[in-house]
Every structure is written in structure tokens, then in C-alpha cells.
């Protein structure tokens, strides 16, 4: 015979559990200037590898301690923060540890060597325990295999780019193997199936993924759509790509588009355009850092709602499909944005209404500039196609952007500064997806928190005049279901393919990704 829990006991337990939960929490992210290994593909000894990792951990320890002293409940550190990059499979191996499944119920700080030599995990565990703070870190996992596994690599092991989470008692509570490896990241293996990793705290439910994962459906969208996490923790080593994929720009837009908190911790390496960390709420950025001028790390802290209220679902095509095309009479022209061919129309005058279309996507813009600055040109652009450079992903993008120069051929080139402020803007598009990420980026890679919002009918519009000159106002849409559709044509031009080999390949080789 089964027994049921008395109703009054169940109700009591419910209220006790609610009382033990926090409505808000303090989050920290640390942008780390990693100490890198020597540029050699010859494996070093385990002792040399540990020496380098401990130098980086010494710096991370300072950030973790400082965050805890300021009341942080959780801190996120970057991808590659502990050992850097410049590896092949063999040269990475001395830096790896066997990271067990968190179900083993293990506090490495209390039970050393339970799973072999694991000094990095032990140190991270002790940092979490001794400071009573959740610690999110990125390290490398190794898993032996043999011929009984038909997918076993020739060297007899799997190597994974891995995120780990230790709770405030030092317990290993999450392990995530990166699914979407960046081009050239061949020192690692892809897990056989995408891993959906969550962990629960008294200040909300969390999901975790890494860097390039953010551009794909799994695990990123699944964590929010199906597992309903409150907050994403995001270790990354992100190279900024303007105009649409600057770290602070895109990560804050993803938080707003998916309506979750987002804790992004980036490597600080300005010579490779790697900077940009932030703490983002669904309605606005709370703290962010972008610094191309110094070589120093940066700790950010901010308070967030543990369970952010979910705003109304946006119908991204509602407004745009209800209005007629806003004919400007201006001639359309083509321009390349990160190797994709956009259709543009030049903005003329201090105010106006414009429409530009490509394939199934029509973009509508209404705007008013604070003043017309003669040596600056802005354009409205549309792209509806498959991006195939460093990855394969289908995009629909509506963008108002500053051209690099007054030459229209530079519309879409990377522009980092501007002088034109806008009194108002309203941007919308006939998107074929519910996954649209709203971006507003000001001059010198600054965000505009509290200056814009998205309406339920799909308009990205200003709430006040911009506080700084505008680089871009963008609706960045992803059609995940078309990433591998046979009829999806690439937006990459033949000229862009040549440029890709010239520009992208050396960067990848220099990072050994």
C-alpha cells in the first residue's frame, strides 16, 4: 500500500522551500588576461603544465576572493583562462584532467585524488569552498577509449573543452563538454550528443554553454526553451567582429532575445580583439567591460533577479508585415558584412522612412538624427541567407549601420567610431523566426542600457535620444531549421571566399583553434 504526503505537510514544505530561495543575487564575471604557454607544439611535462596553470589560478584566486568579499554568490571565469591556447592534441594533453560526472557527489577539496591526480579541480573546489561562492571555470577533460568504441580517436582518448561548476561548499555540481567547436579547435573532440547541463541554486536555475555554442540551437536555445533556466553562465574566448558580433553587443542581445540573465566572461587579449564581458538582464545590460587599450583584467559585479519576469512573447513580423514598403527613391546597392552580401539603401537627410528587402525579408526603418554630419554615411541593410565562413548558420538580419567611410563600398566594413547621434529610431522586419536578437551599439563599442526596448509587435525602438553616437541598430535573426537545408544558398560571394582564406585562416592558425 502506498502512502501520500499529507496536504498540510506538502504545503508547509512548499513555503519553506520558497522561503529558502533568494529573490535576487549578486553575480560576478572576470575578464582575464591569461598567461599563455610558449608557442610550441612539443608537449611539455605535467609539472611545467601545472606551473603555468597555477600562475593563472593565482590571478583567478584574487578575482574570486575579491568577488566573494563584495558579496557575490557566483563568479564566471573565461574559456581558456587556465592554460591559454596554441595547442594541438598532443601538446594539450599535459594540461588535461579526468573530470568525473557530477553524480559521483565529490568535493575535491575534501577528497583529493579520488579520481587520480586532479590538482586543478582540487584548487578550484577549495577556492569555491573557502570563499563560499559558486565558481564557474573552463578546463580540459580527458577520457580514455579503445577499439571497442568505433569512434575512439587514433590516440586512444577523447579530449573535451569543458566547463565545470563548483558550488559554495566546493562540490562539483556541473560538467559541460563544448558542442560547437570553433574552426581549427581540433585539439578537442565533439561530444557524441549535445549535452544539456543545468544546476539549481537557492538563487535560481542555471544553464551553461561555451563561446561558439551561442550561435546554434543546441544546447543554447534548448536550455531556455525546454528547460526554462533563469540564468546562463558563459565562459568564452570571443574575438570581436563588427558590426554585428562584438561580444558585449551580441551577448547582451541574446539575453534580451531569449529573456534570461546572461553572465559572459571573456578572455582579455586586445591584440586578437578579445575583450568584452558583461552581466546582462533580459531588459538591459547591468554591467559590461570593453577595453582595447590596456592589458589588465577586470572584475564586474551586479545584482540580478533570481527569477527574471518573462516579458510578453514578441511577434517579430507583426508590425513589419502590416505596413506598406516605405519607398525612399534611393537606389539599392550591395555590400559585404562579415563575408555575407547585404542589400543596402543609403540614408539621406536628417530624418526619414526607408524599406529594403532581400528574399523573404523586408526591413523597415524610421529615424531622426540629432544632426546631419557631412562626413558620415549610414545605410539600412537586409540579409536573408546562409552564412558559411567559420560556421554554417542561416541568418535574417535588418541593420542600420554606419559605413566606415563616405564610400558606399565600405558599408559593412568594421567601423569602431562614429559622431552621429539619433533622436529616435524604429526598426522592424518580416522575420521568419521567433529567434531575433536586438542590438544597439554606440561608438567605441559601448552599449546603451535603458535607451531602447522591443515592442510585442516586433519593433526595436528608442526610448530617448541616444547617449552616444550610433554604430549600429540591428535585429539579428536566426533560422536554426535552415542551417542544413539543402535549398539554403550561401550568402558568401566568390570574392568573400578569397578574403576569408586571407583574413580568417591566419587568425585561426595563430590561435591554434
Swiss-Prot record:
Question: What is its subcellular localisation?
Answer: Cell membrane
**Gene that this sequence comes from:** VNN1
Q: What is its main location?
A: membrane
List, alphabetically, the GO terms of the cellular component aspect: azurophil granule membrane; extracellular region; membrane; plasma membrane; side of membrane
The record's listing under SUPFAM superfamilies reads: Carbon-nitrogen hydrolase
What EC number(s) is this enzyme filed under? 3.5.1.92
* Reactions it catalyzes: (R)-pantetheine + H2O = cysteamine + (R)-pantothenate
Q: In which tissues is it expressed?
A: Widely expressed with higher expression in spleen, kidney and blood. Overexpressed in lesional psoriatic skin.
Disulfide bonds listed in the record: none
Q: At which residues does the record annotate a lipid attachment of kind GPI-anchor amidated glycine? A: 491
Pro-piece positions: 492-513
Which protein are we looking at?
A: Pantetheinase
Q: Which organism is it from?
A: Homo sapiens (Human)
Task: Write out the GO biological process terms.
Answer: acute inflammatory response; cell-cell adhesion; chronic inflammatory response; coenzyme A catabolic process; inflammatory response; innate immune response; pantothenate metabolic process; positive regulation of oxidative stress-induced intrinsic apoptotic signaling pathway
Q: Which family does it belong to?
A: Belongs to the carbon-nitrogen hydrolase superfamily. BTD/VNN family.
Q: How does it assemble?
A: Monomer.
Relate the outcome reported for changing residue 79 to A.
Answer: Abolishes enzyme activity
* Effect seen on changing residue 178 to A: Abolishes enzyme activity
**Induction per the UniProt record:** By Th17/Th1 type cytokines, but not by Th2-type.
Describe its membrane topology: Lipid-anchor; GPI-anchor
Amino acid at each position: 500500500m502506498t502512502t501520500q504526503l499529507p496536504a498540510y505537510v506538502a504545503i508547509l514544505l512548499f513555503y519553506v522551500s520558497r522561503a529558502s530561495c533568494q529573490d535576487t543575487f549578486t553575480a560576478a564575471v572576470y575578464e582575464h588576461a591569461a598567461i599563455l604557454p610558449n608557442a610550441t607544439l612539443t608537449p611539455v611535462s605535467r609539472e611545467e603544465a601545472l606551473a603555468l596553470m597555477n600562475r593563472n589560478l593565482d590571478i583567478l584566486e584574487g578575482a574570486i576572493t575579491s568577488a566573494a568579499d563584495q558579496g557575490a554568490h557566483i563568479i564566471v571565469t573565461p574559456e581558456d583562462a587556465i592554460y591559454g591556447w596554441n595547442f594541438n592534441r598532443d601538446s594539450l594533453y599535459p594540461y588535461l584532467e579526468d573530470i568525473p560526472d557530477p553524480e559521483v557527489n565529490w568535493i575535491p577539496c575534501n577528497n583529493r585524488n579520488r579520481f587520480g591526480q586532479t590538482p586543478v579541480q582540487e584548487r578550484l573546489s577549495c577556492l569555491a569552498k573557502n570563499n563560499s561562492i559558486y565558481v564557474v571555470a573552463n578546463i580540459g577533460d580527458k577520457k580514455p577509449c579503445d577499439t571497442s568504441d568505433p569512434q575512439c580517436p587514433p590516440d586512444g582518448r577523447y579530449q573535451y573543452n569543458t566547463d565545470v561548476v563548483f558550488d559554495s561548499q566546493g562540490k562539483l555540481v556541473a560538467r559541460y563538454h563544448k558542442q560547437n567547436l570553433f574552426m581549427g579547435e581540433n585539439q578537442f573532440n565533439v561530444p557524441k550528443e549535445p549535452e544539456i547541463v543545468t544546476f539549481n541554486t537557492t538563487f535560481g536555475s542555471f544553464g551553461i554553454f561555451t563561446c561558439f555554442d551561442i550561435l546554434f540551437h543546441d544546447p543554447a536555445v534548448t536550455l531556455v526553451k525546454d528547460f526554462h533556466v533563469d540564468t546562463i553562465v558563459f565562459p568564452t574566448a570571443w574575438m570581436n567582429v563588427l558590426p554585428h558580433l562584438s561580444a558585449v553587443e551580441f551577448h547582451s542581445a541574446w539575453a534580451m532575445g531569449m529573456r534570461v540573465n546572461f553572465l559572459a566572461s571573456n578572455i582579455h587579449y586586445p591584440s586578437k580583439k578579445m575583450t568584452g564581458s558583461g552581466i546582462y538582464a533580459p531588459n538591459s545590460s547591468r554591467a559590461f567591460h570593453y577595453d582595447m587599450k590596456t592589458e589588465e583584467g577586470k572584475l564586474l559585479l551586479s545584482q540580478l533577479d533570481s527569477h527574471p519576469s518573462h516579458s510578453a512573447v514578441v511577434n517579430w513580423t507583426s508590425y513589419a508585415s502590416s505596413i506598406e514598403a516605405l519607398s525612399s527613391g534611393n537606389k539599392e546597392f550591395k555590400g559585404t558584412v562579415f563575408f555575407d552580401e547585404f542589400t543596402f539603401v543609403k540614408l539621406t537627410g536628417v530624418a526619414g522612412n526607408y524599406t529594403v528587402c532581400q528574399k523573404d525579408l523586408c526591413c523597415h526603418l524610421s529615424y531622426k538624427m540629432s544632426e546631419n554630419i557631412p562626413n558620415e554615411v549610414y545605410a539600412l541593410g537586409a540579409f536573408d541567407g546562409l552564412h558559411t565562413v567559420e560556421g554554417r548558420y542561416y541568418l535574417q538580419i535588418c541593420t542600420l549601420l554606419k559605413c566606415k567611410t563616405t564610400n558606399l563600398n565600405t558599408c559593412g566594413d568594421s567601423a569602431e567610431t562614429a559622431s552621429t547621434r539619433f533622436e529616435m529610431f524604429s526598426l522592424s522586419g518580416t522575420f521568419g523566426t521567433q529567434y531575433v536578437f536586438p542590438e544597439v551599439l554606440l561608438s567605441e563599442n559601448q552599449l546603451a542600457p535603458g535607451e531602447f526596448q522591443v515592442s510585442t509587435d516586433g519593433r526595436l525602438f528608442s526610448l530617448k535620444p541616444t547617449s552616444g553616437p550610433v554604430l549600429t541598430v540591428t535585429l539579428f535573426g536566426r533560422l536554426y531549421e535552415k542551417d542544413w537545408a539543402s535549398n539554403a544558398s550561401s550568402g558568401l560571394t566568390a570574392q568573400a571566399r578569397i578574403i576569408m582564406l586571407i583574413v580568417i585562416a591566419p587568425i585561426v592558425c595563430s590561435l591554434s583553434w
